[in-house]
Each structure stands twice: as structure tokens, then as C-alpha cells.
Amino acid sequence: MKAKEINWTDVDFVTTSASYYTVVAEQPNGVMNGLYCLNSLVFPYYDTANTKEKIWWDQFKSDYDYDPNTGAIYGYIFADIVVEAIKRTGEDLTVNNFVKAMETLKDYEDPLKLSSVSFDPGIRHGSNISYFFQVQNERFEVISGPINY
């Protein structure tokens, strides 16, 4: 982080969920250590993953020849949500019917059980929890949460 280069070390940096990406935390020499951010799911690092998460990780690595990152997990989870809504829409797939089907998702858990989402006509953000993370040793570590909002 540029702030460390200019010795601006007495300031804590808190970012949005957009920075919750493994490539951010994994910058060499711990340059991102100390960064804080919020996000609605906890990335399953392989060494701390449960059996289901490891099976998914191994399959991803077998298919793509590299370890999954947060983008991979988001893609997997978001695709699962969309596929479930399409199934619930039925044969008459229109935008309006798809939206109505999305609104039937209540406490819907993704296959890895990392997060659950709910939608209705007044709730469009899906999740209502966040975890507070700090980059430590080039990985995101939960320091608080889940926090309801």
C-alpha cells in the first residue's frame, strides 16, 4: 500500500467489500496486512476448509488448473442462485416471472453453506449480514461477525 511507502502507518484503512478479493490480501511482503473490510461471506481457504469446501476446491483446481479465488466462489454462489430462480420460474421464463421467482428465495443457502440470501419485493440486496475482516499474513481473517444489518 502506498501509505506504508510514505510511512503513513498511524491510520487504519477500511474498505468496501470490493476489496475482499484474495489478490488484494496476497500482495507480497505483507503490504496489505492491516487492511480492514466488510463482506457477507467468509472465503474458505483450503487449509481451514471443511470437507465439502475442499471437494469443491479440488474440483475447481482440476477443471481450471489453478486454485480458486474469491471471484470463483462468488461466481459459483451467484450462478447457483440464478439457476435456482430459473428452476422456480418454470417454462414461462420472462423477466417479470424471473423476478417473482427470485422473490421466493427465503434464507436460501448456497451449496457450500457459506451464505444465505432472501429476496422479496422490498429486499433486493440478498444478504443482511457482514463479517469484519483484517488482512493478516496475506489472507483475510475474520475479526468480528456475523453482524446483522
What spans do the regions from the language model cover?
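Alpha-helical scaffold segments in soluble metabolic enzymes
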Residues: 2, 81-84
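Electropositive phosphate-/nucleotide-binding environments in soluble metabolic enzymes
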Residues: 50, 54, 76, 80, ...
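Segments of small-molecule ligand-sensing domains
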Residues: 62-72, 83-139
